[in-house]
Design a protein with these regions (language model features):
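Cytosolic regulatory regions of ion transport systems
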Residues: 1-177
Length: 177
């Protein structure tokens, strides 16, 4: 839905029963901080309308992160920081931007997914599960997220998975573990 985020537009969009919402910055607002402020206000409006909806918000300026918590958005993606990081990686490791970019484009093979740790993996080491996950499910384990939300990419092989952990995997489709 484009345009103003109002109770009427949220009702028309079905936000009362939606699982997720994505808030994109308005290209009509040239000032990046103004654009981000509008996005954060829209996020807050959506959360007030439906507190259970998962809101992902696009920001353009990392300095806007200081106000992001007020918006109650569940996830914030700072586009400027992503582009800057991608460019710096490409300058340091020629060609790496193709691999990184392909992981976030859904039309590509091999997308990053965040999935719950299966019961059969609880108490086992990350290293022991690498080959098993690849051979049995054709997925590549790349990280572990703790119950506190801390993400560790490429953790040590002896890192043990717990029942409240999530794993970051690369797969051709969402794995059913």
């Amino acid at each position: 839905v484009q345009g103003a985020v109002t109770e009427h537009s949220l009702t028309m969009a079905g936000a009362d029963r939606a699982e997720s919402a994505v808030v994109l910055g308005s290209q009509q607002i040239e000032d990046l901080q103004g654009r981000d402020a509008k996005s954060l206000m829209n996020s807050l409006t959506i959360k007030q309308y439906n507190p259970d909806i998962y809101v992902c918000t696009q920001l353009f300026d990392s300095s806007s992160l200081t106000n992001a918590e007020l918006s109650r958005a569940d996830e914030i993606v700072v586009v400027g920081a992503l582009a800057g990081g991608l460019l710096s990686r490409a300058a340091l490791d020629h060609g790496s931007s193709r691999a990184i970019s392909s992981l976030v484009r859904t039309e590509e093979q091999g997308v990053i997914y965040r999935v719950s740790v299966p019961v059969s993996w609880v108490g086992r080491s990350f290293g022991a599960l690498l080959e098993e996950a690849k051979t049995q499910s054709n997925i590549l384990l790349v990280g572990i997220e703790s119950s506190a939300g801390d993400l560790v990419l490429n953790p040590p092989g002896d890192c043990t998975l717990g029942e409240l952990h999530m794993v970051a995997v690369i797969a051709n489709q969402r794995p059913q573990l």
